[in-house]
Amino acid sequence: MNKTFLLSLCCLMLLSCTSAQNNGVPVFPSKSLEVNTSIVTGAERMDLYLPLLKGKKAGIVANQTSQISGVHLVDTLLHQGVLIQKVFAPEHGFRGEAGAGEHIKDGKDAKTGLPLISLYGKNKKPSSDMLKGLDIVVFDIQDVGARFYTYISTMHYVMEACAEAKIPVLILDRPNPNGFYIDGPVLNLEFQSFVGMHPIPVVHGCTVGELAGMI
């Protein structure tokens, strides 16, 4: 308390002296402070995570929102020499071409030739066979901050399955466009389902990375 009071007193004295030297008119900086408001997503921080993927056989959980400056994450990682073995597809599919609630089938990506493993059909949690041969799994999907969006449920099951298989999961975080807003009741776990797995409000205010740290 004494230190705070002393600091406040010194600031007041300094302001008084400055004002007196300028005929009672305080002097303020002529240029306003510039604040950098650009947002850098986790996927863009390749300098930090590419070393973690070097020489590793990787599985990618992604969809059409997994972009780096307009280029898909999978295309970017392949260009960087990452050994992607397979892609796990959430609701709406890897390329975002399926409707809401439409089951996704296993297949092959037409552009890259990579195997596509559905996580929105008969299997919502990766099996041990699906994870076999992988050294790491990368999750990168844009979320909107609503509890009923199934991407966070997919992330939950991916983390759970990888923990059981002792495979690390890398979450590439993205901003929550509704991160400033929290609303709605907390889920009663008696009604837990794939469209509501966690005891959080309907509009929860968290990023996928923040939720991953709490799961």
Model-derived segments and their meaning:
Residues 82, 164-168:
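A short helix->loop->beta-strand "cap" motif at the edges of active sites that frequently abuts
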